[in-house]
Amino acid sequence: MTATMRLALALTSVTLVLAGCRYSADDKPVATQPTELQQAAADLLQGQVMAVAYSGFREGQHPDRGDGANNPTPEQILEDLNILVEHDFGLIRLYDAGENSRTTLELIRENDLPIKVLQGLWLNAEFSNHEGCPWLNEPIPEAELAANTEKNVAEVAKGIALANEFSDIIVSVNVGNEALVSWTDHMVPLDNVIAYVREVKAAIEQPVTVAENYEWWIAEGKPLAAELDYVGVHTYPAWEDKPIDEGLSYTIENMNRVHAALPDSTLAILEAGWATTASEFADRASEANQARYYEDLDGWASKANVTVFFFEAFDEPWKGNPDNPAGAEKHWGLFFVDRTPKAYFRDD
């Protein structure tokens, strides 16, 4: 290599370094901040800013945990849907293609309710993440993993059928929920998730997404994002020790970082919320903080054109540790389990 070529390469390297940094007064490089996320109004899902995650399990009800499900009745689900309509929710997120989701879709159609649906497909563990998940104490047996794969294949088929049967209501399909993050108890290998996404996209007209924590998208999300119509992000400042005064700014920071990592992707928040009771972070959990976080998110998302599915509509007592009634997992609802409103929707 000649001296001229070495000089040219050196100058090129300096140029590339400077392109990613700015200089302060003392000529020390300072990393630039991610570009502020600003989307077009057309990037909103169904033109909606604030949407909500919906699951209808009430006191004493629960999904199948190995001993059968105790599901809400159609009358109870209809009551829930009417509450959501009354509070101006026109877009809800469902998490699986099972019986409750079909009932919900049928009730929306039969009662001509002004609600559209992000339909979820739940993926069970196809890989034993006992070394990464804090609450998996032993490996998942191979036979169970094989059975889960069969369940996932069936779930995808049911989800495709629902999306086509209820194409007037289902406006998008979400394949998997936190099945890729390092701490999940229902991990599915990335290649398998991509295969499911491709199968769904080939069979329906609606846009397809996947829901994962923001950190996963930043670190590992490019191959999957390239397959999707938009990227579904989860972000929970309260779980990450942030006080309410930093709730919105931390959420925006997370979204800006995802945007920097995936600049060609449209983004939506598929879960963000604030628990009103939480033994895990009691000093930050309150109705007032939830109301503020909702209002702050609404204000930012309206300007940035980001659809937000607030987590969640109603408290769900079946979740989390049954011996800890104050556990956060039970208390994310905008409404109590008896369907009375919390602070944001309450006329005090």
Labelled PLM ranges:
Residues 18-20:
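C-terminal motif of bacterial Sec signal peptides marking the signal peptidase cleavage site
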Residues 181, 185, 235-239, 263-292, ...:
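Active-site clefts of carbohydrate-active enzymes
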Residues 119-121, 130-132, 171, 177, ...:
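Aromatic- and acid-rich polysaccharide-binding/catalytic face
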Residues 104-206:
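Substrate-binding cleft of extracellular glycoside hydrolase catalytic domains
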Residues 47-133:
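N-terminal carbohydrate-binding/catalytic regions of secreted carbohydrate-active enzymes
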